[in-house]
Amino acid sequence: MNSGEGGKDEMPPTSESAPAAPSAALSPGLLCVAEYANNTLAVADPATGEILQRIAAGQNPATALVADGWVYVGSSGGGEVTAVNIADPSQVTSITVGKQPLGLCYDGAQGILYVGDYFASSIHLVDAQLKSLVKTVKLSASGYHNRTDPPDCCRIDPGTGRRTVALALAPEGNLLYCANYGTFDVARVDLATGEEIEAFDGVVGPRQILVSADGAQLLLAGVGGEGEQQVSDLYVLDRSSGKRVQEVPVGQSVAGVAQASDGSAVWAIARDDGELVAFDADWNETGRLSLGVGIDTLVLAPDAKTLLVGNSIGGQVHVVDAPSLALLNTIEGLASPKDIAVIA
């Protein structure tokens, strides 16, 4: 597996033009795309395919999240989170956060943005109102069953820590689940005490973790590695015990997962097969759409009717009708899109 930091495939920088000064408010339905190779957040209209503006977003932005009137962008190469005001995108705040922020998760009840730090093996807590770091939780050096290293396929340097890449918050707000690339497990942080509790086994090359709509399970997508470390299934874990209760066939290198809020449908993408796959609530496959090898980001829009599928190699975001899997549009000309957030 040719992987860069945090399991993100490395891309050479591009010579895109400098971002224009942000202008109008970001309207509901617009896409905010983290352009890794351009150091920008691209704002795009999914209906027309037009890129409306680009906003400077730190070095190598790789994650994006919309929360409480702001777009948060994790700058994986610069140790900062960029916050863009949705009502006035000329208001941009840079928040210094650790070494390499990748996973982002927001707790609206507490007003806290959780930031997974890949190289520091830590979880940072950012006060969303103050736009400042207020606490850091350090993960233990060893993970599930005392793991300290990734498998050979995914190793850069031995013993470099847990390498958190994705986060999910328990619906009760008491636990944070952290999918780790280095020890291919799921760390659990008790948010009341700030302490890590027993980890769950995970997946090689994790990319995304979700709490299921009913709160009973964790959905874990991973791209795997080489040989026996290849992953072609979506892993479903019991949220109480961590036991893997189901392996759902998707295709080679499962790079993303999304679920309807009522649990009636689930979608996943197979990066190396280039397919978007749909399932019903009982995990019966209901359809496939071929979008091309390299698709590595999957997001369900707030309207619950539209899927956004990014291809960081091809520089595209595909707009797909969720119920029918019909391809509605493709946004071209993006500089290694790594994540997508949708304005609600």
Q: Where does each model-flagged region fall?
A:
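Predominantly soluble domains enriched in secretory-pathway, periplasmic, or organellar proteins
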Residues: 1-344
